[in-house]
């Protein structure tokens, strides 16, 4: 393996030093500027052929200039820390405790970003880029807007990869797909009246009550199907002119996750069924508007099909060989993410897409998030070997 990749202990330590530095660089969604500049500087230091930050704030690095285009993507943004007092170390300290690096983003997903940056640079040093172009992106606002950042990158930079590797945490297990997602808003409409005379109005919350019951029943029904999806009411609110008035509008936010075999069109039918017979109800996609750290406007339409690449697909077979070359053994299993990623965009374009990244995804977003730094090194080895084989 050392002969194949030119891996050295010094290079591995430099990778971990950078990884810990990224954790120390706080990068909440829409606040990734410092992280982008840090990554940009490291790419330049490592000898990337081209490095830039695009209009939405994604940092983009390129090595090679061949016809086959390989893309490694990691998002730079992290969810917020609301409980720093509950962490065993400060959440942006990147301290090592019992061999584990602790900190927000240690799993989700600064290990994958660091490993892919160093892998692309190593591939260039080792002369593995003949006929290939490798892009590494640190993308923005993934935690809110799956894929929107990549859509901007591909369009603005006129890039269409042949292969995309999503470096989300998988505990360094080859991951063949993830669930789909539809996020929808249902509204009910009432008539405001004084709280002392509720019979003169129509309570929008009461209008919503039957719909909520139907949501619960739909989730139970989905659970009876092996490998079925889920639906959850994740937010509820109402509008009222005062606390002594009948609410004139009620709004619920639904998060529907789709497993392979389900589709977005099916969910649209489910939404219609939820409001069937309710004259004062409507539904729509939960479209989200965000502004990136550069001022770029992001519009997110949360409706994505589930996807899964075949075990015998050429990319899967190549990943399996890269795994065996890098680690001296065949992969024991494959994985499937039960959450969404930026893969939704390359998959929708027909790009061969697969997942692989360091860290246990069950620890993502959690208090005391942590990752084994050796797994970050291993991911770098895998990415480098994959570049060689593609």
Which residues does each predicted region cover?
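Metal-dependent amide/peptide-bond hydrolase catalytic core
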Residues: 1-3, 10, 185-390
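Acidic/His- and Gly-rich active-site-bordering loop/insert found
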Residues: 1-102, 125-129, 360
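Residue-level signal for inorganic ion chemistry
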Residues: 22, 26, 168, 208, ...
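Buried hydrophobic packing segments
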Residues: 39, 113-123, 150-153, 208-211, ...
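Hydrophobic/aromatic beta-strand patches that form the interior of the parallel beta-sheet core
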Residues: 70-72, 137, 165, 279, ...
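Acidic-glycine-rich active-site phosphate/pyrophosphate-binding loop
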Residues: 81-97, 161, 176-187, 321-322
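Glycine/serine-rich anion-binding loops at beta->alpha junctions
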Residues: 99-115, 194
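Acidic/histidine-rich catalytic neighborhood of metal-dependent amide-processing enzymes
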Residues: 109-183
